[in-house]
């Protein structure tokens, strides 16, 4: 099975993957249908990352979620402006540019595990609904790093809205 996704989105999501050996199943990015998901058990990043799957059998159904470790070196390669997409074949991770040239390659096997039920953690919110969030300095640093990757270094802003006791206040 082949998994292909957007390099920038994967780099941003991978910042949230775990590092603890005791929770080895969090030490990678989970590809679940069109989503890339990573968590360290405290912070979770979910993104529609342009995930597509290749198979010898073109009629094959979308596979079960697969968890792939993403190294710091791979994340660095994905953050380069020339990086376009990433291809993972179960044994190797390759970062490509728009022309199809390989920018980075590393051996990496998928993690044989069951990834946590991330859909049960992410609240469903109607588009116009206000929602609340609380942020620690560690989380804000990771959010800033994620936003920097996604914006290409451009200045960004975050707006927090809320009107109840649990909402962020000005």
What are these regions (language model features)?
Residues 1-170:
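DNA polymerase processivity clamps
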């Amino acid at each position: 099975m082949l998994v292909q996704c957007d390099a920038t989105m994967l780099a941003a999501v991978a910042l949230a993957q775990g590092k603890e050996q005791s929770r080895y199943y969090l030490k990678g990015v989970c590809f679940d249908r069109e989503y890339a998901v990573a968590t360290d058990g405290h912070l979770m990043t979910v993104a529609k990352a342009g995930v597509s799957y290749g198979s010898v059998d073109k009629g094959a159904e979308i596979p079960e979620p697969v968890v792939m470790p993403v190294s710091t070196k791979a994340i660095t390669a994905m953050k380069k402006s020339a990086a376009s997409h990433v291809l993972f074949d179960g044994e190797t991770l390759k970062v490509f540019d728009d022309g199809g040239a390989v920018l980075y390659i590393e051996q990496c096997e998928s993690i044989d595990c069951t990834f946590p039920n991330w859909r049960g953690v992410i609240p469903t919110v109607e588009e116009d609904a206000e929602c609340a969030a609380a942020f620690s300095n560690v989380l804000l640093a990771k959010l800033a790093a994620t936003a920097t990757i996604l914006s290409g270094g451009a200045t960004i802003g975050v707006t927090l809205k809320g009107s109840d006791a649990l909402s962020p206040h000005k």
